Amino acid sequence: MVNMKASMFLTFAGLVLLFVVCYASESEEKEFPKEMLSSIFAVDNDFKQEERDCAGYMRECEEKLCCSGYVCSSRWKWCVLPAPWRR
């Protein structure tokens, strides 16, 4: 019984080792997924957030005024959507 457990463990460890070696050699050959992910998540200067004169949703509004469509929450000091009880 112990001998069978040891042989199963060694077989499983061998399969894991074989998988790791195959994966490492394949990842060296193929850089396509890495290149694809880097091109998808590349940050372009056109998409960077601009500094505005007004504060957007959930931004602090003590020093800045909230943008149109938002009101400054008196409790949290954040720009939030206007609700019927805040008007």
From Swiss-Prot:
InterPro entries: Huwentoxin-1 (IPR011696), Huwentoxin_CS1 (IPR013140). It is found in: Secreted. Residues 1-24 form the signal peptide. Disulfide bonds join C54-C67, C61-C72, C66-C79. GO terms for molecular function: ion channel inhibitor activity; toxin activity. GO terms for cellular component: extracellular region. Expressed by the venom gland. It comes from the Eukaryota. Residues 25-52 form a propeptide. Keywords: Disulfide bond, Ion channel impairing toxin, Knottin, Secreted, Signal, Toxin. Its main location: secreted. It holds the Pfam family Toxin_12. Ion channel inhibitor. The presence of a 'disulfide through disulfide knot' structurally defines this protein as a knottin. Belongs to the neurotoxin 10 (Hwtx-1) family. 51 (Hntx-8) subfamily. Hntx-8 sub-subfamily. This is U3-theraphotoxin-Hhn1q. It comes from Cyriopagopus hainanus (Chinese bird spider).
